[in-house]
UniProtKB/Swiss-Prot annotation:
Protein's name in the database: Golgi apparatus membrane protein TVP18
Pfam family, one: Cg6151-P
Keyword ATP-binding included in the entry's annotation: no
Localization (cell): Golgi apparatus membrane
Keywords: Glycoprotein, Golgi apparatus, Membrane, Transmembrane, Transmembrane helix
Topological type in the membrane: Multi-pass membrane protein
Protein species of origin: Coccidioides immitis (strain RS) (Valley fever fungus)
GO biological process: vesicle-mediated transport
Membrane-traversing stretches: 16-36, 39-59, 82-101, 106-125
Glycosylation sites: N11
Keyword Transmembrane helix attached: yes
Example of a GO cellular component annotation carried by this entry: Golgi membrane
Function: Golgi membrane protein involved in vesicular trafficking.
Source organism phylogeny: Eukaryota, Fungi, Dikarya, Ascomycota, Pezizomycotina
């Protein structure tokens, strides 16, 4: 299945996964920029989210990167739509708290994390099976890992 066909499939877990990829990039870039401002703690939190999301959204990385069995077990918890919606909601909530101090660019990461969480929640509520994008190492590769 090509990338265009994946998007036409109307499977919200595919939309959530690609929004998650955008979150990885935003989380790293904005987190790095925020480390050099007065949002140091939240910038570091955002930087930590980036590799965590990378391992969640690109399942092939668990196969090729040397990680501990505890970390692998933690990442494998997020193989269902409900669990992915939960982790995205928690991450988004963590960055929404940064607004208590002052509005910053971290809100962009929080918004995209919330959107990805909503896509996964919609997929779960519509009882769509979790489908990993073929481009990101899914469809066969993801099944070997889990």
């Amino acid at each position: 299945m090509s990338l265009a066909e994946e998007f036409k499939s109307r499977n919200f877990s595919i939309y959530g996964q690609w929004t998650g990829v955008i979150c990885i990039i935003l989380s790293f870039a904005i987190g790095l920029a925020s480390v050099f401002s007065r949002f140091i703690v939240f910038g570091i939190i955002s930087l930590v989210y980036s590799p965590l999301l990378l391992f969640i959204e690109v399942p092939f990385l668990l196969r090729i990167c040397p990680t501990s069995s505890k970390f692998d077990a933690f990442i494998r918890r997020f193989t269902t739509n409900f669990m992915r919606a939960a982790i995205y909601a928690a991450m988004s909530g963590g960055l929404w708290i940064s607004l208590v101090i002052d509005p910053s660019s971290l809100i962009a990461v929080a918004v995209f994390l919330a959107i990805a969480g909503l896509f996964y929640l919609l997929a779960a509520l519509m009882k769509q099976e979790f489908t990993s994008s073929k481009t990101l190492g899914g469809q066969g590769v993801a099944q070997m890992i889990v």
